[in-house]
Structures are given as structure tokens and as C-alpha cells.
Amino acid sequence: MTGAEMIVQVIADEQVGVIFGYSGGAILPTYDAVFRFNQQNRDERDKGKLPLVVPANEQGAGFMAAGYSRATGKVGTVMVTSGPGATNMVTPVRDCAADSVPLVVICGQVPRAAIGTDAFQEAPISAVMGSVAKHVFLVTDPERLEATIRTAFEIARTGRPGPVVVDVPKDVQNWKGTFHGGTRLPIPGYRRRLQRVTERALPESDCQSFLQFLSQAERPLIYAGGGVVNANASDSVRKFADRFGIPVTTTLMGIGAVDTTESLSLHMLGMHGM
């Protein structure tokens, strides 16, 4: 299996549903692998199982993937070429980082031997995206390609969701190796942090104390953010507010968490709020 085919197989395993992107020379092997995958894997309507949506440019692909992620809860997936194709993704990547939208961007890159030589359509995407993405990978060891792509999806969707960029040189895409299935990179520090957050969940005794403090509050207020929407907890927040008669206001990303026509709704706070 080629590196490009491994990328596509991992994307299929992650059940993202749709790929958004705009082709170019440095990502062509992976686009060809998508077409081959769809020829070999048809759904009940005889359509490929990994539809490819091609917009007018890469930035459009990024925002379409972000919208798709918000609407479906799946990780938005984008494939773009090197240089200008990858730099066109900066704005949607930064937008997803700010709004906690899970996104995986697969960028083509010039062959490893040409990196740093100002080759045609080369750009230092790891450096460019490092300040705007949740995490960036540059795949220099093809043996770690499969694990890197799978780990990118893990990082994108866990903890605070966000965009992960994977820069894949063209020769790594053309490399041939063995697909193992299920492999991930050893990122113990990241996984330990997630575990610590999970372990800090309020115990039952503290929940009872919270409810006692709430009953004594003179002017309680619920300030709901985007995490309520991401966690599909909107219904729980509404029931909680109704039960205790607590007004609810939201952040910009929390819009939709509560019905703004209800008497307990205070709409959105902030620069653009009420």
C-alpha cells in the first residue's frame, strides 16, 4: 500500500463522510488514491464512500469543512497542495482554533530532499501553521505516516477540539509499505493531560454542595458557552434552567444552546450582545 493509500484508508476508518479540498501537484498521489478508493468501495447508490467536494479555492474548502463539522459533529477533513494551496488554509485553520472546531488538514509538500531549497511551490507550512493550529505534523519518516494521520484525528476531536495540520512530502505519499491498522503515535503527555481532566470531574458530594450554594444564591445566572453545543447538552441546560428558574445568557459560540424566545433567555453577552 502506498503512503497516499494509507492516508485515504485512515480517513475512511475515521468515518468522516466527506473530504473537502483543491488539488495540486504535491497532493496528486493522495487525490488519485481517493479516486481509486471510491472505485473499489461503492455505497448502495453506487457512489464512492468518500465523496470529494471541490470548491473555488482552498480557503473555501476549509470553511466548508468547518461548517460540515459543526453540522454533523464529525471531524472536517481537507486536502490541499503545497505552497499557496497550504497557505490559503491559514484563515480557516485559525477560525477553527478560535471556535474549537475539529479539523484535519492534509497538506502536500515538496519531496523531503527539496525541503528548504525554495523549490517550486514550497512553503514552511509547519512554521506558518504552528501559531494558528492546535497541532502540526511534518511527516519525514514514512513508517510513521499511518500513525500520524490517525493521531491527528485523535488530537483534533479530543480535549478542546481544534485544527490539526499534517504536512506530507510527495515522496512519502508515493512510498510503499505495510498498513497496520489502529496504530497511533506515542503522545503520553497529551493523553495524560486528558486523563487528569477526566479525573477532576466533580464527585457526588461536591455536586450536592453546589446545589446547596445554588439554592442560597440571590441572583443566579447561567452563562452557557460553545461547549454546551459541542457536547449536545443544550436540552440539559434548558431543563436545569427551567427547574430552578435561572436566567441564561450565552457566549457567541453558545448561541443556539437555549431558546431566545423563552422568558429566561438573556440572549448573548459580549461586544455584539444585548
What are these model-predicted stretches?
Residues 1-274:
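N-terminal alpha/beta PP-like core and its mobile active-site loop of ThDP/TPP-dependent enzymes
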